[in-house]
Amino acid sequence: MASYSTNDFKPGLKFIQDGEPCVIVENEFVKPGKGQAFTRTKIRKLISGKVLEINFKSGSTVEAADVVDYNYTYSYKDEDFWYFMHPETFEQISVDSKALGDNDKWLVDQAECIITLWNGSAIGVTPPNFVELEVIETDPGLKGDTAGTGGKPATLSTGAVVRVPLFVQIGEVIRVDTRSGEYVSRVK
């Protein structure tokens, strides 16, 4: 298996730490005035989602993780699994709720998602950055009701709840940023 030296560390590098695939979020080479140089890294474990800060001695090595990201198209959901299809090979893959996390609220038919595979099994799903969803429930916006200007909560067709401006009505389609869960615009 391939390995990486601390000299190869950069954000986005994936490796194995404590038997779990991790990705480097930040790294910094530190050369103290006294003592051995080291690399301070902030890593995120891909399965558990924990963020840790670990120091590696200068020149030490870590094992490379066999982690690959693929583009898949969301197909459908049954009771326990969500199914995605590869757009070129038409191969289907099933993903459980542990790998999907809370991203199920952003999945719409034919959505292009990025699935992270480790040793052939799905460990994470990244939905598209923006999705267009219909508002199925929200309070009516009253004319002149602008005190607070914080907007109002709206329930979308997938069950997600986002804050929207007062002018958004039931039945309208809105664009939502899935990374932050915030309203972006109305769709014409």
Curated annotation (Swiss-Prot):
Gene Ontology annotations of biological process type: peptide biosynthetic process
InterPro entries referenced in this protein's UniProt entry, alphabetically: Elong-fact-P_C, NA-bd_OB-fold, Rib_uL2_dom2, Transl_elong_fac_P/YeiP, Transl_elong_KOW-like, Transl_elong_P/YeiP_cen, Transl_elong_P/YeiP_CS, Transl_elongation_fac_P
Keyword match Protein biosynthesis: yes
Record note on modification: May be beta-lysylated on the epsilon-amino group of Lys-34 by the combined action of EpmA and EpmB, and then hydroxylated on the C5 position of the same residue by EpmC (if this protein is present). Lysylation is critical for the stimulatory effect of EF-P on peptide-bond formation. The lysylation moiety may extend toward the peptidyltransferase center and stabilize the terminal 3-CCA end of the tRNA. Hydroxylation of the C5 position on Lys-34 may allow additional potential stabilizing hydrogen-bond interactions with the P-tRNA.
NCBIfam families on file: efp (TIGR00038), PRK00529.1 (NF001810)
Pathway(s) it belongs to: Protein biosynthesis; polypeptide chain elongation
Gene giving rise to this polypeptide: efp
Keyword Manganese among UniProt keywords: no
Modified-residue entries (N6-(3,6-diaminohexanoyl)-5-hydroxylysine), positions: K34
Keywords: Cytoplasm, Elongation factor, Hydroxylation, Protein biosynthesis
Function: Involved in peptide bond synthesis. Alleviates ribosome stalling that occurs when 3 or more consecutive Pro residues or the sequence PPG is present in a protein, possibly by augmenting the peptidyl transferase activity of the ribosome. Modification of Lys-34 is required for alleviation.
Family: Belongs to the elongation factor P family.
Transmembrane segments annotated in the record for this chain: none
Compartments (UniProt record): Cytoplasm
UniProt protein name: Elongation factor P
GO cellular component: cytoplasm
Protein origin, superkingdom: Bacteria
Main location: cytoplasm
